[in-house]
């Protein structure tokens, strides 16, 4: 989980910090978007192996990492993949856990489950904001819009899931 979080935030920081050339920026954006798949799968890994820890956990882990690999390939090959399409995949991938919700609820403490659910909801709201480019601000707010709001939700979701992972130690 931590490795996937570091990879995502490192890729995002590099992409959002440096403006080298249009070609390099396009590559960095692709890597940034690919790392979202890695973070989602990285978040699932301890849930599947520690919380579920059975055949359904291994199946879910295989499914999620399979989706991550396919998503990475799609992002690598589809040059102008629409934001809404990527967002739908990210959100759907994030909610695959619904298939084992009873087991997850039974295995986690109520507090850990609440943090897990809160993180998922926060990420989902951020994904919807990103996909729909909401809210639409007037020209007064040129440097703060849906993309920046999305990143605030991503940090909130990451913080919630960090609490869950810490509780599993």
PLM feature spans:
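Multi-pass alpha-helical transmembrane bundles in non-GPCR membrane proteins
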Residues: 1-169
